Amino acid sequence: MQFNIPTLLTLFRVILIPFLVVVFYLPFAWAPMVSALIFCIAAITDWFDGFLARRWNQSTRFGAFLDPVADKVLVAIAMVLVTEHYHSWWVTLPAATMIAREIIISALREWMAELGKRSSVAVSWIGKVKTTAQMVALAWLLWRPNIWVEYAGIALFFVAAVLTLWSMLQYLSAARGDLLDQ
């Protein structure tokens, strides 16, 4: 297996995940800011690795597999951390909705790939907007420097949950014929 810069960036994102968890639980005043910084660095690599892979024509099968896995693991763990911190339905409900959607759509994409129709459930613009809203909301909720950033983070978290449901309905609609076909 050949490693290139986009794949190394994806691996770097995976390596950052345990550091995010450890720093999140440190009993220091700077821990929320540093955990948010780690998350932001990881989130930026999510955009940057794909950009470089396309720009430099360095897409690999391993990278195509690892990138969405790293993204989903990073986001799911950040959601679990934020949910654990707030201990409230208004954070848990959107987090559970978004995690469930990721599982459903991952299964749908795998199934559609088996049918040779993976492109019918390719990432859409609404999925990209959803991911951006998730990343920004999670960064704010990890950082939480003041009540206004927390409120904005929670509001954006709900926006991300709505976009999550919207994009899921789009993907399911695109696959409807195959899902209902005998």
Curated annotation (Swiss-Prot):
Biological classification of the source: Bacteria, Pseudomonadati, Pseudomonadota, Gammaproteobacteria, Enterobacterales
This protein's UniProt keywords: Cell inner membrane, Cell membrane, Lipid biosynthesis, Lipid metabolism, Membrane, Phospholipid biosynthesis, Phospholipid metabolism, Transferase, Transmembrane, Transmembrane helix
Example GO molecular function: CDP-diacylglycerol-glycerol-3-phosphate 3-phosphatidyltransferase activity
A Pfam family assignment: CDP-OH_P_transf
Primary location recorded for the protein, binned into one broad class: membrane
Membrane topology label: Multi-pass membrane protein
Family that this chain belongs to: Belongs to the CDP-alcohol phosphatidyltransferase class-I family.
UniProt EC number: 2.7.8.5
Location in the cell: Cell inner membrane
Ranges of the Cytoplasmic topological domain: 2-12, 82-86, 169-181
InterPro entries associated with the record: CDP-alcohol_PTase-I (IPR050324), CDP-OH_P_trans (IPR000462), CDP-OH_PTrfase_TM_dom (IPR043130), CDP_ALCOHOL_P_TRANSF_CS (IPR048254), PGP_synthase_bac (IPR023762), Phosphatidylglycerol_P_synth (IPR004570)
Encoding gene per record: pgsA
Pathway in which the depicted protein is active: Phospholipid metabolism; phosphatidylglycerol biosynthesis; phosphatidylglycerol from CDP-diacylglycerol: step 1/2
Function text: Catalyzes the conversion of cytidine diphosphate diacylglycerol (CDP-DG) and glycerol 3-phosphate into phosphatidylglycerol. Essential for the synthesis of anionic phospholipids, thereby playing a role in balancing the ratio of zwitterionic and anionic phospholipids, which is thought to be important for normal membrane function.
GO cellular component: a single term: plasma membrane
Source taxon at top rank: Bacteria
Extent of the signal sequence: none
Transmembrane intervals: 13-37, 61-81, 87-107, 146-168
Periplasmic side stretches: 38-60, 108-145
Organism: Salmonella choleraesuis (strain SC-B67)
GO BP term, example: phosphatidylglycerol biosynthetic process
Known catalytic reactions: a CDP-1,2-diacyl-sn-glycerol + sn-glycerol 3-phosphate = a 1,2-diacyl-sn-glycero-3-phospho-(1'-sn-glycero-3'-phosphate) + CMP + H(+)
Name this polypeptide is given: CDP-diacylglycerol--glycerol-3-phosphate 3-phosphatidyltransferase
